[in-house]
Amino acid sequence: MEKHHRLPLPELHDDKHRHKQCNGENSNRFRPPKYKTRGYVAVDNNNLNRSQSLGSCSTNSSQIAHAISFRDAGCSDSSTLPSSPVQAELSTLSLSHFEQCFERLAKLGEGSFGEVFQVRDRSDGQLYAVKISKQLFRGEQYRAERLEEVRRYEEFSGHENCIRFIRAWEQYDRLYMQMELCRESLEQYLLRCQRIPEERIWHILLDLLRGLKSLHDRNLIHLDIKLDNVLIGEDDETCKLADFGLVIDVDRANSHHATEGDSRYMAPEILQGHFSKAADIFSLGIAMLELACYMDLPSNGPLWHELRHGILPEEFINKISLELQSVIKSMMKPDPAQRPTAEQLLSHPKLQYLQKKRKSLMNFSMLSRSFRRSRRAVWGRMCNWKTAAFRYLLYFLEVLHLCKPITASQPNINIVPSSPSSKGVPLVPQVEFQLVGSTPIANRDCYASDFLSGEDPLDLSNQGSPNVINSTPLNTNQGKSRLDLLKNNVDSMGRYVHVHDFESPCSALSSAKVLDTSSFRRKKLFVLEYDDE
């Protein structure tokens, strides 16, 4: 697959198109001021000892990890970082606080002052980004300058479009800053996507203007706005400003205490030593030009001056809409006084529309979340009501079942004639009884009429096999006692029961005996032979 590269700016061969500075301008041109040491020490009373300089600090104190924070400046007690259980286990290995608390996974980036690593917290397993200063503290003033970045991170950490800062500490004359881990930088996003939709560019511009306005409202300037210093959050939508190492107050910046950022994004007035909020607007405008046109910005040369004089290459600028062209050109005007402020840009109709759209979507998302929560609550209550109602119903049915009267079953006696053709013959009652035996058999009701059809009552070949739970023991009495027993039972009961032999049908039932057939349920053990009497 062919790799796409960003197109360079066209070379200009005609001298009349070159924007050279005349000798008079060169005489008044100043070199960019270098970063000078500051006359104050911005040190927190809670963590640092103001009475000692870095050179006079003992070696043991520099090896101890001290927390850095400007949020509780009123505290005067110096404290060290608390030890976690994992840190306590690794403390015997003479590891730094960073190595004890974090597992280094990858290197995310590198700047002029430090390196950024992706780490995993050993205590909770969460992923973070930790920035470690490259150089050792060369003195108290240099240390105070590095700690100023911690103050700025803590100041803007709560803003939606600024990176979230967690904590900072110093150990072994180095500064460590723990921050949230974002998905990627805007530079990486551009290299991955190459062509970014214009609607997405408008959203990115809105995020960065909101973050930049939070700095300008405090009379601070960033001075290092570029695609590498813009990070995309975990939601893959929100863009956040990062790297506040060059952030400085506007009043102090013009007294030669400021340092310029990347020359590709630098405003032209920075070369003259004039620092203002408009410099951040220019840097943001040229960053949007790079993002929208996918072009490679020059770091110096005549093309660099072309962009600083408001001349944009037509072959690049024609690829975007006129509305976006107008905004970018207004942000890149050579005169800082003619550039719009962050607040004025946020009042642009397109950006106003996006803000209203975001607000409506935010309200809708909040409403949907609250609806889902309320729906879960209502459904939970309904389920509780259903469960309670079902329990009450079961209890009611159980009470009804217990209150139902129990009626004893009476035997059914049907008087039928013994022979349909005969007249005057006594009727024979049909008696319903149940066979009970020692062998467990499924409840089976037998009727006397089953044995009144002329068949042998002891012939069980046509009766079907009952469901026997256990086996029947074999007869070991040589068959004689069993035969006598059966004959006695048959003789005592008789094959027919006549009504006239008793005073009433009930007396006939009372005289009937229960037939025990448990001994011949499984198979016929022998054949009955009656002697002729």
Swiss-Prot record:
SUPFAM superfamilies named among the record's database cross-references: Protein kinase-like (PK-like)
GO cellular component, one term: Golgi apparatus
Keywords: ATP-binding, Cell cycle, Golgi apparatus, Kinase, Magnesium, Membrane, Metal-binding, Nucleotide-binding, Phosphoprotein, Serine/threonine-protein kinase, Transferase
GO molecular function, one term: protein serine kinase activity
Kinase in keyword set: yes
InterPro entries, sorted: CC_SR_Kinase, Kinase-like_dom_sf, Prot_kinase_dom, Protein_kinase_ATP_BS, Ser/Thr_kinase_AS, Tyr/Thr_kinase_Cdc2_inhib
Region annotation Disordered: where it falls in the sequence: 1-35
One Pfam family named in its UniProt record: Pkinase
CDD domains, per the entry: PKc_Myt1
Residue numbers annotated as active site: 224 (proton acceptor)
Major place of residence: Golgi
Enzyme superclass (EC): transferase
Binding site for Mg(2+): 229, 243
Similarity annotation: Belongs to the protein kinase superfamily. Ser/Thr protein kinase family. WEE1 subfamily.
Protein name as annotated: Membrane-associated tyrosine- and threonine-specific cdc2-inhibitory kinase
